[in-house]
Amino acid sequence: MLAATAALVTAVPAAAHDGSARPEEKAALGAEHAQEHTKVREQILKLGGYSQLARIDSLNSLTRSQADVNARFHPKAFGQFAEYFQSPDFAAHIAMLPTGKVLLFSFERMETDPTEEPAPTNTLGKANAGRAFLWDPRRGTGAAAFKKVTPPELVVPDGTNEKRPAPFFCAGHAFLPNGMVGVFGGNLGYGGGAGAKLSLVFDPWTESWSVNKDMEVGRWYPSVAAAPDGRLLIMSGHTDQGWGTSTSVIERFPAKSHPVPFEKTLIPKDVPTDTLRVDAPFGTDSDYPHLFTLRDGKVYGLGRHATKQWAFDPVAETRTDLPARPDGVHRGYGSAVPLPAGLRGPDSVLVLGGDRDDPNTYRLTSGGDWEKQQPRAFGRTQDDTLLLPDASLLTVNGAHGIRDYGNGDYNPKSDLKYRQIETRNALGEWKLGPAQRLPRGYHSNAVVLPDGRVMVTGDELQQLANDPKIDDDMNGSIEIFEPAYLHQGSRPSLDRAPDGPLRYDTAFTVGTSTPDQVKKAVLLAPTTATHSLNTSQRHLELGIVKRQGNSLRLQAPPSANDVPPGYYMLFLLDENGVPSAAKWVSFR
């Protein structure tokens, strides 16, 4: 009887699992029969494991509710979610590469039931393995648009002596000046979060990985940021002794004894880190601290706890205390963004999210002053906030807690509000917008694509709970958001940009077939993100110093303090902030 009725239920459009009968079923079957269908769905959810029917039912429900909510939001004013498709990876870590492709990496799943923990945090041996894929947006949305780029096989000190693809789950990462991604730390598979000493580099030009010398200490949940000289600073993280044994050692990659990799051909292999004279005592409650290099050349470390706030000088190797954040509490996984500052690099950071009870946002200046800014509609954790080409901010994703979407731990059912985006304009005003398809909290991510769209992905629990075909190899999902500026008329055109590296404080020429439409030129840093952490964000205007026919002369930023060396997306904008598609440029 159960199987026969379940088959009938699949033919009916889905709605939320809230214990009530669906209106369309009541109309077609009568109240009593409709309620029977509701009970069947609840029984299916209670069966051993998590059924395929439950996943399809949940995805259909989310699709319907998304359409209902988003009918109220006009794309011209709020933007729209345009695409939703499956991917082969959970994308707990992502990076927007200067080749135009997106690197997705995470772990081999331990569980398909989203009411259980799917990550291998406490799994020894070869089952604790990493995986990685490239998505090429130019190839569309099918399986052929993805390429597997398996990390190097190696042995980690977990006592098993078993080789496996490097378990870089819960590592930290940032870009090197040559466009490569440095990945540091990972998961040893015991102790609730024991940090590996792994040091890897992904080369987007050859689409391959290289292994470097182990770090001095193991790190699980570290943060990494690029200093103005192009070297990466690695801070915090739990050691190889497990959760609660965080390290205060700051490491630098590459070590000062090795050159900074500016050229594409200089691939770091077997390169060591070295340690700074100063430490970073973020403590056990400040995993994945936010790190940002501001235009004074210092790296600002903003811990989860209100008192763990410092500015690090990477040249003098010193640390300066900053005032405590005014909220006075511990903030969990929330976002932070270096705010645009016109023609110069950022000199302030906006801290937001990480506290479900506090919708306020907090701005820290490089002078060490805090001020409360305008609040968002509600508090949320696990959110991702991005800088857009028009200098507005976009928040996607969010949850009530780490694996809690408003209905208890490991319950995939989500409060609708956590699916709604929020945007912040130049005046600092926030407004709620359309809803994404999936709730996405812990391990969710987002990046701005070179065409101005936003890729939203991550959260393996929700991806498993809403997988339309759990037995295939496409257990992740991606959705694409089109900001409002993509619905406000024709776009400027950027046709040519210099191929070689640009020098600071000099002018360079770009070509456009729409010169009269161009009012502004901006740089937007590509980002690499995980766990609501995105240390590479940056937005900078470039002065237009000369116009001649279809050519524009643009003024490069004054120094590496304003724009650390590396690759950036260059956009041309019209008077309404509508951007062109980007061209890649590099600075050194």
Walk through the language-model features, giving the residues of each:
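Kelch-like beta-propeller repeat domains
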Residues: 17-588
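Secretory targeting and sorting signals
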Residues: 1-16
